[in-house]
C-alpha cells in the first residue's frame, strides 16, 4: 500500500518524479516534469535506478561494476540537473538507488509523501512505448499517484503549451 500524499498540506510542495536513464525519451520526461514543476510552484525529483542484477553474480568484479554504475549515475544526474537549472530555473532533487525499476519507483513514491505525479515518456520504437512504460503500466495498481506519459511526438512548443 502506498502512503498518503501530503503535497497539498501546509509546508509541503507537490513533487514531480522523473526517471533518469540512458534512453532518449528520458529527456522528454524531464523537460515536461521540470516545466510542470516550475509552472505549478512544485518541485522536481530525478530518480536514477541502477539495475543491480547486472553485477550481483561477479565476485570482485561486481564491486567495480557497481562503482562504475554509480559514477555513471552521478554524472548523468549532474548533467541533467545542470540543464534543468540553466533552462528552467529550478534545482531538482536527485536520488540514486539500486534494484528493479518498478519496485524502486514504488519504494521512492512510498517513502516521499510529497511525490504526487510520476512522469514518463514513451519511446518511438515500433516495439511499443518502451520497457519502463510497459513495466509501469503492468503494475499501475501499485501506484496511488497519477502516471503521466509524454507522447514521443510532442515538440518543445507543445510541451510548453500543456505545462
Regions found by a protein language model. Give the residues of each.
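Gly/Ser-rich helix-loop-strand patches that form or flank binding pockets
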Residues: 1-5, 110-163
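Short helix-capping segments at alpha-helix termini
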Residues: 84-88
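Rossmann-fold cofactor-recognition segment
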Residues: 92-94
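Charged docking surfaces used in two-component/phosphorelay signaling
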Residues: 96-104
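A short acidic, amphipathic alpha-helical/loop segment
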Residues: 28-32, 107-108, 135
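Acidic, proline/glycine-rich short linear motifs
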Residues: 48-75, 157-163
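Small/aliphatic-rich secondary-structure junction motif
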Residues: 10-60, 143
